[in-house]
């Protein structure tokens, strides 16, 4: 080997030979040589950098902090009573359940090591992981799970989750095993099992709504509360949280979180612009678009919400005529609503099932016809149905009836009232609908109400012709509440007051169908029936809008159903990162 290097060395010019060669160059030749050397150096450096990059990957590092801004004030930071968005956001960070919804939309074990389901779908048995702890260091046991579920089921607790647990019993098999027994199969039960678990030792003996742990929570989730700042009035300004290094799915990468609370959206936006918070959600599309235009990073995901016009045939007889609803569906410019009102943070829909409902293959019934063609179709439908535009510019219909050899003529007006909330998006949508329908000769009036008044004075007594309204469909079983005939009257949510015996049977069967393929077929049949009967005109599904830090990695909101779902995989988020070669990343 030494002889080899000596031979190579003898082939290279010596220092004196190189000096002699360089001294023989002219000034111009020296400059060319220097230039060539510089080009070679830069080229070599670039090649080395590119090779290095091709072998490098970015990996998350533990550490860093994140400040999140939220509108509202938390009051019940516990999974049994959480009501507001602020409550639910903190609850999702502090608590964990037997299962957790993963970013794919499927459910994975969380506190549970495993679970089994009986063949008849009536029994779910969960086995807890070893060495699982609450933030104060006490172990999580089967007793804590049973205590939490019984608190939810207790009518005196008035938990908003109670209806999900009616008819379900829970029993302790041993210290690590819990069994749930159902009266009938329930395809959404694994979602029930995501409810956060309370430490029984802290909550026992005190009325749940009065316990100090409502604002000083201790759970087993990815983050634990380390501090709270309150105003002199007792209103909470912010919470500080730290990663829980015994979280069963792994210690979170981000070390510290601060959740800051603001009374309204304007104050929230000011905090973002002033750098007091890094991230915010729940903004109107208009404000989100303004922030996007000045460089903020926005992530969005379509929510399982169905906004539409729901018709009350009992109050407005014109809606018993399907031709009228068919014409309305053609005439309403849904694309314009999504573009102008939602700023494209949403999608148009034609069906009662949200476009991103898991495991449901949407029927593609979109058309490629132009707006002008749709208007012509709408007018043609109404003309064929006997509606004629009068001198006042609106449609009228004259019908002739004979009774006892006497002929009677009566004239109907194609006029109705849209009732809706006073939220900006609803008001703007209602005005576009009115403009679209006026264009084809319908006379439309709009009545807007404060949301609470809309519910009490309009929705509950069913006093409306057409209701511009949104349905929140977190899972398939919610469709029962919105479309089964048993839910037509208050407190039911069937605001279209829809009745169809076939649909009732489909929804009843779907609730107890565990096999996913069969359940999907049933919901496809349900959708066919709704589209045939046309009890509503479906308009759009809005998106969840999230302004996030540009340094944030690991966020996945593709399958969220509620705003707090954005934190489902927060333990995988990171704000600190480094580059290493691929071979060292495993």
Task: Mark where each language-model region is.
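Ligand-site clamp/hinge motif
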Residues: 244-290, 434, 443-445
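Append "and occasionally in soluble cytosolic enzymes with long acidic Gly/Pro-rich linkers
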Residues: 229, 235-243, 321-435, 525, ...
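A structural "hinge/loop" feature
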Residues: 53, 72-88, 111-112, 138, ...
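Gly/Pro-rich hinge or "lid" segments in bacterial periplasmic/extracellular proteins
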Residues: 194-256, 266, 274, 375-384, ...
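Surface-exposed binding/hinge segments that line
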Residues: 161-205
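Aromatic- and charge-enriched surface segment that lines or borders ligand/interaction sites
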Residues: 2-11, 113-158, 179, 318-320
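Detector for C-terminal structural segments
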Residues: 49, 331-364, 424-434, 457-586
């Amino acid at each position: 080997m030494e002889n080899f290097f000596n031979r190579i060395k003898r082939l290279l010019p010596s220092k004196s030979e190189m000096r002699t060669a360089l001294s023989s160059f002219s000034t111009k030749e020296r400059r060319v040589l220097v230039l060539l050397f510089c080009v070679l150096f830069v080229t070599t450096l670039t090649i080395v950098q590119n090779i290095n990059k091709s072998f490098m990957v970015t990996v998350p590092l533990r550490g860093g902090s994140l400040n999140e801004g939220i509108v509202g004030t938390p009051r019940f930071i516990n999974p049994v009573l959480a009501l507001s968005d602020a409550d639910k956001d903190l609850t999702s960070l502090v608590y964990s359940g037997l299962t957790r919804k993963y970013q794919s939309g499927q459910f994975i074990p969380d506190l549970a090591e495993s679970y089994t389901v009986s063949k008849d779908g009536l029994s779910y048995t969960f086995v807890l992981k070893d060495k699982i702890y609450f933030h104060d260091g006490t172990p999580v046991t089967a007793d804590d799970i049973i205590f939490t579920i019984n608190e939810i089921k207790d009518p005196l607790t008035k938990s908003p989750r109670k209806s999900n647990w009616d008819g379900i019993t829970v029993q302790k098999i041993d210290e690590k095993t819990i069994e749930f027994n159902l009266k009938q199969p329930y395809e959404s039960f694994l979602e029930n099992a995501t409810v956060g678990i309370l430490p029984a030792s802290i909550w026992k003996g005190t009325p749940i709504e009065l316990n100090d742990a409502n604002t000083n929570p201790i759970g087993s989730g990815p983050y634990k509360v380390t501090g709270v700042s309150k105003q002199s009035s007792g209103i909470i300004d912010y919470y500080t949280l730290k990663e829980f290094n015994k979280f069963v799915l792994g210690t979170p990468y981000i070390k510290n979180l601060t959740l800051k609370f603001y009374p309204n959206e304007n104050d929230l936006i000011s905090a973002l612009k002033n750098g007091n918070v890094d991230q915010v959600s729940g903004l109107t599309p208009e404000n989100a678009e303004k922030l996007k235009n000045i460089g903020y990073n926005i992530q969005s995901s379509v929510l399982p919400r169905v906004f539409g016009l729901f018709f009350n045939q009992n109050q407005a007889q014109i809606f018993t005529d399907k031709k009228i609803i068919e014409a309305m569906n053609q005439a309403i410019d849904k694309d314009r609503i999504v573009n102008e009102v939602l700023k494209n943070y949403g999608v148009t829909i034609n069906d009662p099932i949200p476009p991103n409902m898991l495991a449901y293959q949407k029927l593609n019934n979109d058309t490629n016809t132009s707006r002008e063609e749709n208007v012509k179709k709408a007018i043609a439908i109404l003309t064929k149905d006997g509606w004629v535009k009068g001198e006042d510019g609106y449609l009228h219909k004259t019908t002739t009836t004979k009774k006892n050899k006497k002929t009677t003529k009566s004239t109907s007006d194609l006029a109705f009232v849209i009732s809706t909330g006073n939220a900006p998006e609803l008001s703007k949508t209602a005005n576009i609908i009115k403009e679209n329908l006026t264009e084809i000769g319908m006379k439309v009036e709009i009545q807007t109400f404060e949301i609470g008044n809309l519910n009490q004075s309009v929705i509950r007594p069913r006093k409306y012709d057409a209701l511009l309204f949104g349905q929140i469909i977190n899972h398939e079983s919610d469709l029962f509440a919105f479309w089964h005939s048993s839910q037509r009257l208050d407190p039911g949510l069937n605001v279209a007051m829809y009745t169809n015996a076939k649909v009732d049977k489909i929804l009843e069967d779907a609730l107890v169908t565990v096999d996913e393929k069969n359940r999907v077929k049933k919901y496809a049949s349900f959708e066919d029936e709704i589209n045939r009967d046309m009890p509503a005109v479906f308009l759009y599904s809005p998106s969840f809008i999230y302004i996030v830090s540009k340094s944030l990695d690991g966020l996945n909101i593709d399958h969220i159903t509620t705003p707090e779902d954005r934190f489902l995989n927060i333990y995988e988020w990171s704000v600190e990162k480094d580059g290493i070669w691929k071979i060292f990343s495993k």
